[in-house]
């Protein structure tokens, strides 16, 4: 039986681990990030992958730094024939990459060489792409730069969010892995080098990227809101207060107005001007210190005026 070590951390990784178990491989160990404090009470919380591994009685390693010798030697001691990673969250050292008979392969949520990095799902939507996908490739020390083994395309729908696309790609990754591993073991795959001229990056989202830039086009603002839903969530400011914007709709704006200005207030939301003739009607938001709510609920208690400028004093 093929001995596999799985390395992964978030919810995205769980269906991949589950599929390895269902397909009958001997998962001899799981490597995941350490437990982290979560929420206002800072409750020490295990990763989703750790929770899944423990359900199946699989030994779990949680190195703070996998590149340290005493940590990677624990992985090598498991003597895996194959290592599979999916959103592990640390750069894996060569000592591990070179050890397994069938190598180390990674399940990545983009059509490489596009969108290398830790936030490919967010960026696929934020950049307005109509499709993305899953790539399974050999791992190298350089970020997401290994030779491609298999790929599958996944359509991005008009109202797709990072949350819904995350779920689709997670399942697509598990399914593609199920088809890829037997072909890899049988030596039936021809690795394809990535075209370095086509490389783009999707680095982890920083706080300053979450703010809505109303000077962009309506389409770009709409994609920005979708791409940061349900985490970390786009935000703007209204009357000097931070407001998270959970959802908006593209609407035509016929009269010229300064970008970021409220140009219409309707029953279900208010329309904000952008840099072109497509405005964004905010329909779901979350004022600072309050719960997420529909804009119609918000407007019952707060009455912004037409001409109010959003995005100032953030």
From Swiss-Prot:
Pfam families, per database record: Formyl_trans_C, Formyl_trans_N
Enzyme class: transferase
Keywords annotated in UniProt: Protein biosynthesis, Transferase
Catalytic activity: L-methionyl-tRNA(fMet) + (6R)-10-formyltetrahydrofolate = N-formyl-L-methionyl-tRNA(fMet) + (6S)-5,6,7,8-tetrahydrofolate + H(+)
One cellular-component annotation, GO: cytosol
Molecular function, one GO term: methionyl-tRNA formyltransferase activity
Enzyme Commission no: 2.1.2.9
InterPro entries (alphabetical): Fmt, Formyl_trans_C, Formyl_trans_C_sf, Formyl_transf_N, Formyl_transf_N_sf, Formyl_transferase-like_C_sf, GART_AS, Met-tRNA-FMT_C
Residue spans crossing the bilayer: none
Keyword Transport: no
Binding site residues for (6S)-5,6,7,8-tetrahydrofolate: 110-113
Homology family: Belongs to the Fmt family.
Known function: Attaches a formyl group to the free amino group of methionyl-tRNA(fMet). The formyl group appears to play a dual role in the initiator identity of N-formylmethionyl-tRNA by promoting its recognition by IF2 and preventing the misappropriation of this tRNA by the elongation apparatus.
Name by which UniProt lists this protein: Methionyl-tRNA formyltransferase
Source species: Bacillus cereus (strain G9842)
Gene name per UniProt: fmt
């Amino acid at each position: 039986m093929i001995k596999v070590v799985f390395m992964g951390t978030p919810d995205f990784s769980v269906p991949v681990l589950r599929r390895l178990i269902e397909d009958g491989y001997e998962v001899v160990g799981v490597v995941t990030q350490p437990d982290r404090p979560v929420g206002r009470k800072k409750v020490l919380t295990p990763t989703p992958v750790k929770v899944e591994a423990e359900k199946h009685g699989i030994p779990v390693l949680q190195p703070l730094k996998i590149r340290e010798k005493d940590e990677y030697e624990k992985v090598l001691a498991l003597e895996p024939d194959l290592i599979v990673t999916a959103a592990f969250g640390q750069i894996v050292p060569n000592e591990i990459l070179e050890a397994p008979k069938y190598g180390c392969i990674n399940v990545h949520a983009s059509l490489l060489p596009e969108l290398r990095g830790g936030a490919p799902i967010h960026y696929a939507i934020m950049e307005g792409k109509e499709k993305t996908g899953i790539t399974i490739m050999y791992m190298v020390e350089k970020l997401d730069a290994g030779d491609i083994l298999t790929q599958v395309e996944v359509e991005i729908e008009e109202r797709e969010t990072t949350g819904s696309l995350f779920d689709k790609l997670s399942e697509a990754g598990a399914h593609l892995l199920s088809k890829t591993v037997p072909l890899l073991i049988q030596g039936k795959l021809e690795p394809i080098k990535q075209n370095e001229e086509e490389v783009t990056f999707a680095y982890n989202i920083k706080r300053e990227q979450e703010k809505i830039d109303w000077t962009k086009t309506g389409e770009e603002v709409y994609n920005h809101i979708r791409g940061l839903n349900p985490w970390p969530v786009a935000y703007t400011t209204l009357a000097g207060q931070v407001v998270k914007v959970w959802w908006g709709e593209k609407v035509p704006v016929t009269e010229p107005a300064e970008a970021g200005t409220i140009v219409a207030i309707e029953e279900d939301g208010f329309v904000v001007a952008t840099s072109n003739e497509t405005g964004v009607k905010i329909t779901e938001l979350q004022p600072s210190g309050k719960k997420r709510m529909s804009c119609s609920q918000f407007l019952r208690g707060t009455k912004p005026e037409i001409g109010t400028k959003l995005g100032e004093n953030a």
